[in-house]
Design a protein with these regions (language model features):
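Extended hydrophobic leader/signal-anchor segments used for secretion and membrane insertion
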Residues: 1-123
Length: 123
């Protein structure tokens, strides 16, 4: 399972910020992302599946309704009946829709835009 931690504490509600920076922990997205990588993501406020289509194949940030405050990094693989099917790139160790089932669109809270890895920026 790949979870992330916020870079810093803030008094501004995180949902109000258009971009966030988080640190990666875990190995479920190897080789794309590794523990210690920093990710910049654009926050999303999806209310229904109509906005999922442009995210297909992209890496998204998930906040499960059953795990509030915990974020997961996964790739949006497909849309099933208006729900998001996500998987980690390292399928042998990833906990994802294969265990959770498809997610509500509201559980997709961001799209990863940029990675900072060990001293260099990359996409």
């Amino acid at each position: 399972m790949m979870a992330v931690r916020p870079m810093c504490q803030t008094t501004t509600p995180m949902a109000a910020l258009p971009f966030r920076l988080i640190a990666v922990s875990g190995s479920s997205m190897l080789p794309t992302f590794a523990g210690g990588d920093w990710l910049l993501f654009r926050t999303l406020h999806l209310r229904d599946a109509s906005h999922l289509q442009p995210l297909l194949g992209k890496v998204v940030v998930i906040e499960r309704e059953s795990y509030p405050g915990v974020h997961f990094i996964k790739r949006l693989k497909r849309i099933d009946d208006g729900r998001a099917w996500v998987e980690g790139d390292n399928v042998d160790v990833s906990t994802d829709s294969r265990q959770w089932g498809a997610l509500q669109p509201t559980e997709i809270v961001g799209q990863v835009l940029l990675r900072y890895r060990r001293g260099r920026a990359s996409e």
